[in-house]
Amino acid sequence: MKILSIHDLATIRKRAEHNLSLREESNEKVTEKCYGLASGARHLQILICGGTGCKASSSQGITDNLLKAIQKNEITDKVEVITVGCFGFCEKGPIVKIIPDNTFYTQVTPEDAEEIINEHIIGGRRIERLLYVDPKTEHTVSDSKHMDFYRKQLRIALRNCGFIDPENIEEYIAREGYFALADCLLNKQPTDVIDIIKRSGLRGRGGGGFPTGLKWEFANKQQSDVKYVVCNADEGDPGAFMDRSIMEGDPHSIVEAMCVCGYSIGSTKGLVYIRAEYPLAINRLKTAINQAREYGLLGDHILGTDFSFDIEIRYGAGAFVCGEETALIHSMEGKRGEPTLKPPFPAESGYLGKPTNVNNVETLANIPIILTKGADWFATIGTERSKGTKVFALAGKINNVGLIEVPMGTTLREVIYEIGGGIKGGKKFKAVQTGGPSGGCLTEKHLDTPIDFDNLLSAGSMMGSGGMIVMDEDDCMVSVARFYLDFTVEESCGKCTPCRIGNKRLLELLNKITEGKGTEKDLDTLATLGQVIKDTALCGLGQTSPNPVLSTLDNFYDEYMEHVRDKTCRAKQCKSLLTYTISPERCIGCHLCAKNCPADAISGLVRKPHVIAPDKCIKCGMCMARCKFNAILVC
């Protein structure tokens, strides 16, 4: 149906609220009881993660098998199976959640589906082996509200992910969806909307941290016959999937926010620039756009007003540099994805030379709820200069890996040791890298740093788009810096000399050091050259690319010195600095290592201790992998 008024919108909300009422109620209550048809439950819902990660692990097969088991038991009128967006706890996927008792099943397989129906849904008995096991207590936890991973989170940008069916516009409307747009069109002037966003303190979540309301104001003040709203969905950081998850789990929030932005700056055209490697996010966005058009929330005369707005999707080829707004705009125009010097800013001259407002996905996801709950509500969350929450992709040597959203001001210690569950295997924390490949590596002394834009910069890192990688004692910080620099060298567009040549020289120096050929003078060159690149590169990619090198030099100088002076790697990660030997006490002469050595570097008689020839050894580690007696020593 075409929505022509706020009354039509309210009618749909009332109709759709029934679908969500069971989920809403279960979200509010805490219960240890397991509900099944045998224990008196009249209606149950099974929520299945439909994000990319879980789909890659056969969540669709789980859905299919659940539906078959429901039909087989003739309970189709009592049980619903609903595909939702990402729950965030990606390492434990595929995830299945039972409503109304909030039972949270992890690492479910298609073969588990029939057991879930027979035992839980019909019998009212939880399946213990599918429950989450707390890494600290080693006890099972059935309800996500009791899990440390979720307890300290505050889901604002992710508010609908894992809760609504992302392909059902009416479920989005039932969660106050499109009411912010309606209120803006019917009750507010464009400048009123901009004022609310400014007062909220929302800053860009794509890495720059520029005040969103101020950016909208600049675009609003430009005089032009055509203006554009661009959603930057080109998420290029390795291991980062914040924006992808929002688009997959709550695409209508992006559509609504782009409409609001269009109204605020005087634009009738929106463009989503998304990498083609995100097929599921693309399909969900297409579905949301088509549904919004069908319901009259995109297109001409939205909600019966004079405001018209529509959205197109443009595909990127996955270049990291195209996350920078001027490079992104060039790519959309069919040109090489190269940044340009600012000013002029896109708000003055952007896509096709017209005023263009560019916001990333997470920034836009905050817009509808800010307008619904008010600027003052949002401004009470976070720190003085960084309001609201931030979504992070938490990964690395940590027990709880996944997507998290925390209030600004939450400390790194809280994220790593409470939400993240501490370091895997009880090993010692060494560093945390924030901000993606252009971020810095922070140490134990930084763990009590409150996370916000300014504090992370002061500590020698950055917020970036939200990558957070935790490292333990087995990680070599010189090798880590080399890994990230290798990525930025590959992703450089090559336009400016500091980035194209300077970063290549930095990488050569790091390769030299990890190969045992470095000198103390090389460390001085790294520091000097890194600072020159920061000061002179054209765009954000080049200006921030030396961060991993400079931060590890500052915080782990002793490791660099060990590499260049002692020719050793304490973490045993730099192959050229390792020496493989065989313990004569442990070796029984089984000859297995010699049989598997690709360089024929191991010799010895059967049942006699073997030896490794250092001049032949290529340090591949095959002998260590094959030895069953821990006789291979590395130093």
What kind of region is each of these model predictions?
Residues 50-58, 197-219, 318-330, 336, ...:
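Conserved phosphate/anionic-ligand binding catalytic regions in large, soluble enzymes, centered on
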Residues 182-223, 379-380, 385, 393, ...:
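Accessory "access/gating" subregions that flank catalytic or transport cores
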Residues 92-96, 498-504, 592-609, 622-635:
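Iron-sulfur cluster-binding cysteine motifs and their immediate structural context
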Residues 388-400, 406-408, 412, 570-618, ...:
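C-terminal accessory/binding modules appended to enzymatic or scaffolding proteins
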